[in-house]
Structures are given as structure tokens and as C-alpha cells.
Amino acid sequence: MTEKRSPLPKSKLWEELKLKAELGIHGVAITKQALDFVRPAELAQEQVHNLFEMDFFVHDFELPSGYDLPGGISVPFRWNPNSANIIDLDGNRTIITNKGHEVAEVHFHKRPGFYGLKTSDGQEMGTIGALYRHRALFFAYSNECSYKDRGEDCAFCNINHTKDVYGEKKGIFWKTPRQIGEVAAAAFAENAVDHLTVSGGIIPERRELEYYLDVAEAIQEHTGLQDFNGTAVVAAPLDLRQIDRFREAGYRTTAMNIELWDKGFYETICPGKARTSGGWDHWLHALKYAVGVFGHGAVRSNMVAGIEPKKRTLEGLEHLAASGVVGTFSVWCPNPGSELEGHRSPVPEWYIDLAFQTTAIWKKNGFTFQQVSDCNASNDSLQHDIWRIEDDLLPSLQESRLELA
């Protein structure tokens, strides 16, 4: 993975990392003038609510997907109209201000060309696959989860609420293997991606497990790539032989997100996973089995950090890494429509500390940056950024940024 070096000194990049954490925790507001200037879904890449609503509030207008800070650190756009950080227009520049003072200039991500194309059955490609920063493509085959039917949604998750709010409105439905194959082919043809992820909610009777095999075949057929550098994100299958089938189908990596390391928290916060996917112990066993199939550093498990004590999360990250699993964490956002809506995440410094320790765990256990990038749906996390800064891997701002005159 070759990326251009950032033009800023590391001291400035560490400041940007802290700002990214703050913007991720507290969100950002945007003025009408700035929003009209960047024109999401026309010039700037727009949000695609194919799985979760990550903003503080639902909305019926287009918002941008993300932006770059001056040193090249990318920040997902998380709208909070009450945030003290506000993106405003200053001439032809978009800037973050706080209490009237300029904090940083930002460059919004340019809308990819394939977003404007349609599949052979007439579906807009931008509703099928979402382009993430650093050349990652994300497919959510389903924007709903059957845990809801039994009242066992993960407490931090708003997948079903997001479908109810945005599904019909934005034309986001179940994706067919052919649709995914066609969008993958268009993204690769545009040279926009070099890694893709397939994920989604749990389907009754675990029918999604067979679906992953059909998707892999369709991607290979339409892209012409036998190795398409894909990650299959699944709930741990009860029959572990299914993991072998993912590898045989052509996926390079797999992921099973355990979410929480403390069993007590896990059973309370993730009742569906605890009761119908074999439980915490089976999940861990499945991850270790997957390492035997895919290899060291080719299996990932994510945790939603900030719900359980940091010490427990770190214990999990250490244990997973020692087993060959890339343990990652995401910043917990108490999303609208989730059971934990209205709760508060830890402070930004809490996550910065966890990110530094996570990156150190990765390196100590012999993972490469390529590995921790390939097995993640998005390698745009705080821990990935720390690795980039430490090893001079940050790209320049020329990576598909939006230039407006």
C-alpha cells in the first residue's frame, strides 16, 4: 500500500488527530452557505445510510460523507447542529470555526464517478456500495437485522431504525449479488478502490451465509478478479465449516465482531448475539478457528469502545492479537433510534489513549499495516491514523478531494 507523505510536521498531525477525535465525539455543525457551496450528491460525496445513521439527528436533506484536515487526516462527517465546531464558508474556503475563531480549513471528499451510474436493473450505484476513505468499498446486503423480531437488537445499534427512516426515502433495499458485482466492477474500473467489504444484518435461519458465496461469485464474474481483496463480515456461524467456504469462495479476509469483551456487558448489550449466535465463548472460538483458515492478521473482530471499562477492552484486544486476530475498536456513538440514544461517549482523550495502545498491540503482535487495513471495512480509524503518522504513511490531500474555486 503506497501512499504519499503528508506535507505537515508530525506535531501538527498529532494536533489534527486530537481534533478528529473531538469531531467524532461531539460532531460538527454546518452553515447553509457552506452546505450550498459543497453541494453534497452533486460535487461532494454524500452520506449513504446503507446500515447506520451516525449523525446526532435524522435529517431529510443531503449531507456530505466526510472531509480532510490540512495534513490529510480524514474525518467522517457527523452532523450535530448543536456542536460548538461549525463548518462555515470563508470566501472560497470551507473552514471549521469555534466561537468565531478559525480552527482548520477542510476539504470535502469528491463524489466518485460511479455514484452517478446505474446497475443493469436501474438502481443507482451510490445506494448499493459506499466508498470509504483510503480506497475502501463497503456493501451492506441488508439494512435490517432479524434480532429486532425478538426484541434482541444490540443496544448500541440503530440498523433497523435507519432502515425505517431512510430505506424507502433513499431507495436503499436488499442488494442482489449481481448489483454488488456490477458496482464493484465500476469502482475498480474507476481505480477508486483496492479493497471491499460485504456486511449486513442477521437474516432469519442465517440465510445470509449462503448469500456471501453468491456475492463472491458475482464480484469475480463482473470484475474479472479471482482475488478481489474482500472481507466477509458475519456473525459467528454455528457450523464453523462455513468459514472454510468463505475462503474457498474468494474472500481474502473475514470479520466477526465480538463487540464487547466483558461477558456481563456482552449478554446485556448484545442479547441477540449472546442467545442465537452461540454466545461469547463460541464467538471467540470461531475467531480462532478463522485464523487457522485465513491466517494470522487476516481475521478481524471489532469492539464498540466506551461502553465497558477501557481495561476490559484492552484485555480483549491483547488476547485477540495474541491469537492472530486483528482486534479493532470503533468510537461509540449513541445513535438516534438505538436503545442507548441519549447516553454519552467517553471524552476524546479516552479514545486517543485507547487508539495509541491499540496500535502498539498491533505492531507488537507482528501485524502489518496492509493487514490491519485489508481486514477492516474502513481503515480511517484513530488507530490507523496513528500508524500512518508514526510511519509517515499519510496521503497528500490530492486523494479525491473536492476543489472549489
Q: What residue ranges belong to the model's regions?
A:
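Residues forming well-ordered secondary-structure scaffolds
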Residues: 132-134, 152, 175-179, 210-214, ...
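N-terminal [4Fe-4S]-dependent radical SAM core
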Residues: 66-153, 160-172, 392-396, 402-405
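Short, well-structured alpha-helical patches and their helix-loop capping segments
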Residues: 146-149, 172, 176, 204, ...
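Conserved AdoMet/S-adenosylmethionine-binding subsite of the radical SAM
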Residues: 181, 185-189, 199-345, 350-353, ...
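Auxiliary Fe-S-binding modules of radical SAM enzymes
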Residues: 1-98, 289, 293, 314-405
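Short glycine-rich or small-residue beta-strand-to-loop segments that form or flank ligand, phosphate
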Residues: 138-140, 197-201
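Conserved alpha-helical substructure of the radical SAM core
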Residues: 162-196
